[in-house]
């Protein structure tokens, strides 16, 4: 069995300012998205320019942070939000929802489309290959924070989280790093390397993420304040992923 390493969540301090690893992971995600977008524009000679790319990353960053935090409080910790609304601003403590962030990015993309006259699916197809590496960085942030641990297991790589209990658990943050991050990146990046019908890349991302999340959540300990939210075995993350999967299937079929 493995033991979770005692990692200081603070990467470094600049005077009174403490820079957390979790925040750095988000910065890495946004920077990697810009670099990948820049490479795709140049390599594939896409009808995008650097100003549009920078604006898109900026809009998306706001959508991810605001939507992710609000989504977490609404989907996962609503009672805490009602009684202590100021916790909404404690982003460095963790507590971000991918599905909330996705909704935030949808709104940001809509505003971006209005500004630049691009279609929503064109923007979605451009953004989709840029996202998984950011998801991978976010899951590493979860691991460093020692949060979102897995269910009790007897597999040889089970990890004991001393701050939780003395039972070996699935390192589910690393599973999600591998599935939602690395595997999904390879899938989407390779698929988007050739011209595709508009909407197909977006559809593949929606389906791919939903499937990865549905699998990974089966190893993850449900949030203590929620438990299983449907049928006695579905977690909130799985419930929120099902509409993604259905929309992805519908979009894939519609764009065949």
From Swiss-Prot:
Main location: membrane
Catalytic EC class: transferase
Gene Ontology biological process terms in this record: lipoprotein biosynthetic process
A GO cellular-component term linked to this record: plasma membrane
Residues annotated to bind a 1,2-diacyl-sn-glycero-3-phospho-(1'-sn-glycerol): 139
Localisation per UniProt entry: Cell inner membrane
GO MF assignments: phosphatidylglycerol-prolipoprotein diacylglyceryl transferase activity
Task performed by this protein: Catalyzes the transfer of the diacylglyceryl group from phosphatidylglycerol to the sulfhydryl group of the N-terminal cysteine of a prolipoprotein, the first step in the formation of mature lipoproteins.
Record protein name field: Phosphatidylglycerol--prolipoprotein diacylglyceryl transferase
Organism listed in the record: Legionella pneumophila (strain Lens)
């Amino acid at each position: 069995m493995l033991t979770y390493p005692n990692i200081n969540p603070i990467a470094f301090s600049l005077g009174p300012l403490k820079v957390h690893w979790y925040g750095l992971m988000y910065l890495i995600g946004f920077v990697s998205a810009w670099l990948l977008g820049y490479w795709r524009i140049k390599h594939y000679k896409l009808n995008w320019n650097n100003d549009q790319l920078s604006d898109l990353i900026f809009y998306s960053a706001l959508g991810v942070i605001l939507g992710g935090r609000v989504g977490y409080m609404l989907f996962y910790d609503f009672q805490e939000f009602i009684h202590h609304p100021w916790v909404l601003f404690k982003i460095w403590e963790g507590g971000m929802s991918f599905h909330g962030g996705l909704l935030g990015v949808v709104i940001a993309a809509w505003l971006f489309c209005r500004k630049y006259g691009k279609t929503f699916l064109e923007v979605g197809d451009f953004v989709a290959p840029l996202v998984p590496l950011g998801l991978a960085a976010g899951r590493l942030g979860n691991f460093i924070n020692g949060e979102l641990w897995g269910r009790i297991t007897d597999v040889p790589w089970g990890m004991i989280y001393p701050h939780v209990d003395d039972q070996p658990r699935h390192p589910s943050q690393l599973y999600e790093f591998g599935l939602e991050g690395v595997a999904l990146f390879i899938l989407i990046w390779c698929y988007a390397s050739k011209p595709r019908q508009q909407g197909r890349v977006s559809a593949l991302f929606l389906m791919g993420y939903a499937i990865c999340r549905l699998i990974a959540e089966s190893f993850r300990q449900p949030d203590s304040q929620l438990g299983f939210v449907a049928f006695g075995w579905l977690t909130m993350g799985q419930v929120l992923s099902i509409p993604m999967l259905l929309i992805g299937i519908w979009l894939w079929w519609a764009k065949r």
